[in-house]
Amino acid sequence: MIEHVLDLGNQLKKELETSTDFVIDSYNDLLIVGMGGSGVAGDVLKLVLNETTQINVEVRKAYGIPKVVADRRPKCLFISYSGNTEETVEAVNDAIKNNLDWSVISSGGQLLELAKEHERPFVKVPPGLQPRAAFGLMTKAVMHYVSSDKDGEYLEMCNQAGEYLNEVLSNQSENELLAQALNLSKEISTKTSVIYGGTPSVSYTHLTLPTIYSV
C-alpha cells in the first residue's frame, strides 16, 4: 500500500482512456453510485460540484436506485473500480430499466461491459489495484464529469497537483517519509484524534480509530 501512496502524484497526472467521442451533456441533477474506496471518488465530485455549481448531487452507497429517485430522472454516474460490485451493478440495471441517462467509471468488469453494450460514456482506469490504492486515478476520472466546459480546467488542476506532490516527495527520501509516518502513527495510536478538515469527506475518510472530526 505504501508504494501506491507514494505514487499518488503520478496517478493524478495519468491520462485515462475514455469511450469514443466521450461527451457529458449538461445536467441539473446527478446521482452517483459507488461503494467503499470507489465511492470516495463520488464524494470528491460532489464536493467540487457543490462548491462550483447549483447542481443537485446525491451520492448513494447501497443497492439499486429507489423509485422516488428514478422518478426525478437524474443523470447517473456509476463508479466501481473492479466493475463487479453487486450494489453498483444492480443500480446500473435499474438505470437501464428506467431508461435513465448514465455512464460509468471502472477498470473493467460488468460495468464496462454494460457501458459498451449500451453505448454509454465511460472512463477506464488502469486495473490491478485495491480501490483505496487507486484514489488518485479515481479522482482524476471523476473530473471528466464536472461539466463539458470545465472538465479540462479541473483535469489540469489534477495534473498540477500531481506535479506539486511529486516535487514535495522528491525533497525527501522514501525512508525519511516512512520514518516520519511511523513515528506519527505511534504517537496517535493510543490517543483519540481530533481532526479538522475543510469538508466532511476529507475529515472522516479512511479513519480506523475512534476519532472526533469537525469541519
Give the positions of each predicted feature:
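An accessory alpha-helical subdomain
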Residues: 191-202
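Single conserved hydrophobic/aromatic residue that forms the stacking wall/gate
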Residues: 206-215
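A short, well-structured juxtamembrane/interface segment
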Residues: 13-24, 174-187
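N-terminal amphipathic/basic leader segments beginning at the initiator methionine
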Residues: 1-17
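Secondary-structure boundary/capping signal
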Residues: 20, 53-57, 213
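Glycine-rich phosphate-binding loops that contact phosphosugars or nucleotide phosphates
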Residues: 25-166, 170, 206
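Terminal, contiguous helix-loop blocks that mediate binding/assembly
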Residues: 190-191, 214
